[in-house]
Amino acid sequence: MQEGCVPWPEPTARAYREQGYWNADVLGTWPRTPGQDSAAALVTSAGTLTHAELDRAADRMAAGLLRAGLAAGDRIVVHLPNEAELIVLSLACFRTGVLPVYALPAHRSAEITHLVATAEAVAYVCPDQVLGCDFRLVAREVLDRTDSLRHVLVAGEPGPYTALSSLDADPVGLPAPDPEDVALFLLSGGTSGPPKLIPRTHADYAYQLRESARLCAVGEDDVYLAALPAQHNFALACPGVLGTLRAGGTAVLAPAPTADVCFPLIERAGVTVTSLVPPLVPLWLDAAEWTEHDLSSLRVLQVGGARLDPETARQVTKSLGGTLQQVYGMAEGLLNYTRLDDPEDVIVHTQGRPLSPADEVRVVREDGSDAEPGETGELLTRGPYTLRGYYRAPERNATRFTEDGHYRSGDLVRRTAQGDFQVVGRINDVVNRGGEKVPTQEVEEHLLAAVPVVAAAVIGLPDPHMGERTCACVVPRDPARPPTLRDVQAALRGRGVAAYKVPDRLVVLERLPLTGVGKVDKRALRAQLDA
């Protein structure tokens, strides 16, 4: 395994092989039936590639990577938007053993510098310009701050650097990757500091996307819309773009997740499956009330990244059609899905149950003892697609993993008697108001259900007498008629919320800051209020 990575213990790895969770399946080289060669594989703003064309493009870029001097084991930071180059380059990396480190669209020079330095990356791959940001200038800053970069590869006009399109050469014979070698690096959520690198092997990631596609009934007739950035684990492999391509289906990459962009794509491409984070769902529901686009092809709408409040969840099928599937997981591994045939009550009120029968999950109290069903505790997990350690992070690993290899998620959950999980929040995401602990996610759900807002976040602000007071930050449904603090307090009291949980302060915003993976960035929110 790659230096700096933590392997599974050999007895555990052997068991995963023997039980069939890990096999010879490697990313990017999947068998196809003859009819799939001419079927659409990838649809982007630049056009459509068939499965055969995508395969050839990946082979040519793989040869181009090798001709440019990159080799198996080299790390490259991939910072591309939802365009064909992202997927072609990913497949080329999987075939050559070059290891992509997936940066997120919102990242800029500080984050890219951190990723390059941590991975000792030899290349940075970026677009020329997106939404007014010139990423060639970002590259210049990163080059000035790091020592390992040898290549800057630009999709579009390269300026002083190298055009990504120049990585084009006649295909060459390539040795098959070892399924248990690292294939790619994902990023942690970054809610507690700079993102950490998550090594994923061919074997574990192939199992994840293969099993996710089976559970979601994704096959060659399906069309998956990557509304979210395809570097996200959610949009990439749950089953996402890679799971859909492996199944012989079609992946459509949206340049933005907004309804005005995605609804026409759903109609035009006949999209059957897509994925959203909770802040986007109310916006799609509002847009669905007036859209003239035909959304009837949509079979499954996955929602994950944070808990979806039940009131909003109930509206999804009524407004958008298809089946809502709640997904609770982490780039580190464990995935939980509601099943497509679950009762409505399970789909609305829970975030699903584990993907694999080999997922080992504990819910523990503060003292480390196992919680009872219905009792809140921290989720700990290990399994055939859950990492055993972050990349080059021994100090972090010492606190985030138990001695027997369970990953400490930091998530507070409840497990029902039927085995489904309900996400309560994060261990450190509580407000200590005069000694009373205010669970912020609970209050946020009350706000979304009882107040006319499309987004809500509750944070603690310092107070000389109480230690902290609660502040509700909201985005109003109608900007011309924002709620007042009195409105909010009355609405929550009307729902029977305890007095200490009712917000002390209200801040109305145009939008909430989000992390790269679509979660509310409460650190940025606090900094915004302090400014």
Regions picked out by a protein language model, each given a short descriptive name:
Residues 21-23, 38-83, 87-91, 108-113, ...:
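Conserved AMP-binding/adenylate-forming core of the ANL superfamily
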Residues 354-358, 367-400, 438:
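Conserved ATP/PPi-binding loop(s) of AMP-dependent carboxylate-activating enzymes
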Residues 206-223, 233-273, 287:
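Conserved AMP-binding/adenylation subdomain of ANL enzymes
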Residues 347, 362-380, 417-418, 479-486, ...:
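Conserved beta-loop-beta connector loops within the AMP-binding
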Residues 38, 169-189, 194, 199-203, ...:
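Conserved pre-ATP/AMP-binding loop-to-beta segment of ANL
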Residues 271-275, 287-346, 360:
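Gly/Ser/Thr-rich phosphate-binding loop
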Residues 67-68, 98-164:
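Structural core segment of the AMP-binding/adenylate-forming
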Residues 107-114, 124-126, 274, 383, ...:
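AMP-binding/adenylate-forming catalytic core of the ANL superfamily
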